[in-house]
């Protein structure tokens, strides 16, 4: 296992630089913020009585986990967030009602930030969704860490790290499920909404930890030299977060950090397939080819036959793309010592994960699937093809600077190789506004846009009742796959998915 070795590579603005005997590749002419490899704490015990500012409490558990962790280690903790106490009520209620916490060491500054909280702190714990550049609060901080950097600095677990644009959450879920079923005492954390600080005290040098990394979480590790995964997986790369990065080269530059400090004792798993037209590296070839040239680890390519390939007869989760995610999980399980046939048997019982084509309800023969984690158009387009027959699609929302062509071409029938939805229901939002002209031009019938889930589901119920009276055939799946962000109507994609499932169950009993 790789453990927490000293960094042997250096990351500097605008390029990924390995040792001189390794490949050199200039990624893009931009400035990336590089963090210090030094930590403000010499040890976990050194946290006691330090002043910690947690930048961002949030509703997904990351800020809450950091507050709990540092309080448990005897620190003085200040939690600050731009959101108000009313907006953060669920998280605050959990913290304030927990009698095991030392509330005399906990302070809240909500509804805005105070520069003094950053200037006076021994360490600031940063939210990954906050850019360093141009942020006066971070610029005033003596030291900046994240929940992931703290976990990686002070543990020596074998890390299985996964990033990518499509399929990373499903892949980590399948890996974690497989490890547990194979008898490993494994843990899962990261971008899948579980902070690794929640299980910090439960791991040791033999505990496999599966971590999903967003590009932002990886960017927050640049220069620290703490991420040395025994196994690194990069799932399919497609345009994402282009409203943040502005171009694919900068976006992928952060993804590439996942393997920057691997060694020849480690494994890298990359795509062998083609990138979508116009989305590959400026230097030519594919992203998978580039990754394979750069990493020092042993390379395994998926989307091609290898010694680790498994032929899945069936999976509980629908879609060919889910078979690819399961294949990556099968490869990881084999690298961890699980026999190939056993890996196949385990993964064929994998139930999938919440908010990813999650079957959750049946009403009058109609099966309902929650795919709220589909925040990019390509994911929603894939969901329409996952069942091998036309679906009733509930989609739309707020766009984030992405091309909508892949989804629009399915909806308006331009993609002749794809199954067009049997019916379309649209949530209001800027992404929906960009889809509508193509649908109108093609004379596609659609419902909406609706300003709320309740309005959309009310119309859907009426239509399904009418269809049930007229149609005795097998009912089409009803799939909620927005292909857009949740912001505006919901706190995040998980809040959106939970509210969708609750609304469906309440309305369709």
What does each of the following model-derived ranges do?
Residues 70, 124, 162, 191, ...:
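Residue-level signal for inorganic ion chemistry
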Residues 45, 71, 116-121, 128-268, ...:
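Phosphate-binding loop of NTP-binding sites
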Residues 75-83, 268-272, 394-395, 420-429:
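Short internal beta-strands
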Residues 35, 43-51, 69-73, 315-421:
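Nucleotide phosphate-binding/pyrophosphate-handling subdomain across enzymes
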Residues 77-81, 188, 301:
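Short beta-strand "acidic-cap" motif of Rossmann-like dinucleotide-binding folds
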Residues 30-146, 427:
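N-terminal leader/targeting and accessory segments in enzymes
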Residues 8, 16-22:
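N-terminal amphipathic/hydrophobic targeting modules at extreme N-termini
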Residues 91-98, 404-477:
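C-terminal helical cap/extension that packs against the catalytic core
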